[in-house]
Design a protein with these regions (language model features):
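Charged, low-complexity intrinsically disordered terminal segments
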Residues: 1-206
Length: 206
């Protein structure tokens, strides 16, 4: 099916992608979905990470091919978003996705590399950015640039804490699981300014 987000000048490595309120995936998210369907490798830095099941499965499939790495925040001005992301760690870790939490400071960067394509711009990798928020992203398809960006992500991961699956499982109490599940639901439907006020007190996310 033709969609303007998926059809462009093939001679140009640059594509501007727009997202906005839609009943389905926004145009920029449709391009990401299209690229993830056949992705061999995925590397991502995201301030907010709470996508739906379909996107999670695509990332996990890439992990089975050549690999998938996620660099996510350990600290945030919106602790509910940190809790929402942590709810998803288990299924991803079981499928071979590497996850690290950035330690030096709060993480606001949005950066995604899928094979030879780099996405940079305003969009997080959560339900609001995929379906609702007005977003502007630039997609750059260049193998050398993608390799350089992956090197940058690797250096940032050196400043981060690698999430170990066994330790992650031990740290999940029933209360923690409930808090994370509620956070995931809230950040998917409520504006970020609202979820900031609804934060569960989590000193690790401050």
């Amino acid at each position: 099916q033709w969609h303007p987000a998926l059809h462009h000048d093939m001679a140009s490595p640059f594509r501007w992608l727009i997202g906005g309120p839609t009943r389905r995936l926004s145009p920029w998210a449709q391009v990401v979905k299209h690229d993830l369907e056949r992705a061999r490798r995925v590397d991502m830095i995201a301030a907010y990470f709470s996508p739906g099941r379909g996107m999670l499965k695509r990332i996990a499939r890439a992990a089975k091919r050549e690999g998938a790495r996620l660099l996510l925040p350990a600290k945030s001005d919106n602790g509910a978003t940190v809790a929402a992301a942590r709810l998803l760690y288990g299924p991803l870790l079981r499928r071979g996705v590497e996850i690290a939490e950035y330690q030096p400071c709060k993480l606001h960067m949005k950066l995604l590399v899928i094979d030879d394509a780099v996405f940079v711009g305003s969009a997080n990798f959560d339900m609001r950015s995929l379906f609702l928020n007005l977003e502007v992203m630039l997609r750059i398809e260049d193998a050398d640039f993608a390799r350089d960006v992956r090197g940058f992500i690797a250096r940032e991961i050196e400043e981060s804490r690698i999430i170990d699956f066994a330790e992650y499982r031990k740290s999940r109490s029933l209360l923690t699981l409930v808090q994370q599940a509620i956070s995931y639901l809230l950040v998917g439907v409520l504006d970020y300014t609202v979820t900031r006020r609804l934060n569960f007190r989590n000193p690790d996310a401050d």
